[in-house]
Amino acid sequence: MKKFVYFCVWIWAVSLILAVPAQDSSAHATFPFYVYKDGGSKTNHYIPSGFTGDYGAIKMDEKCRDNPKAGETCVKFTYTGEPTQGLNWAGVFFQNPANNWGTVDGGNDLTGAKKITFFARGDKGGEVLEFKFGGINGAFSDSGGGTSGQVVLTKEWKQYEIPLEDQDLSYVLCGFAWVTEQKNSPGGMTFFLDEIAYVNDSGAALAK
């Protein structure tokens, strides 16, 4: 009798599991889809954790209150220019989850996005960097990648874009990144980023 009861309970439990609809893994994101909006914001989908190159020469303040473009904070980076790892270049990848170089299934389907928009400013002006997304290869890899090309910052906030036309955005593991070479700023540099977002029309994630 007990075996029969256990069997009936097992059948009931299995029927409940089968009745739960499967999550649609093909669902696309809603836009604007923020990489960074404010330090600690729940709307941030990526984390500036992938320090690379001469990573020992990079300092970051993810909740900088020094004149953010919008909201309460921006993210501040300082690169001293020192060849701490002997490479003469440095950068930071915004990853999901933190420190994910393709070992964890953390990519987002951003199909439908038309461009990445973001605001940047330099502490002195004249700072030379390249901004990009994608580029992580591993057990889990980015489906695409693109770049802004070389950018020279000004002291005032300025909006920049990375076009996404013809990009495969079905799996975006690195939502954003910056890189620079020591030769571009031998004395180092400090710069600020804010309102980094994927958008799907002619508009953008502008400051409110």
Positions of PLM-derived features:
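Bacterial N-terminal signal peptides that target proteins for export
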Residues: M1-V9
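Bacterial N-terminal signal peptides
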Residues: C8-I17
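Sequence-pattern detector for short linear motifs
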Residues: V5-Y6, A19, K124
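Beta-rich carbohydrate-recognition modules and glycan-binding surfaces
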Residues: A22-K208
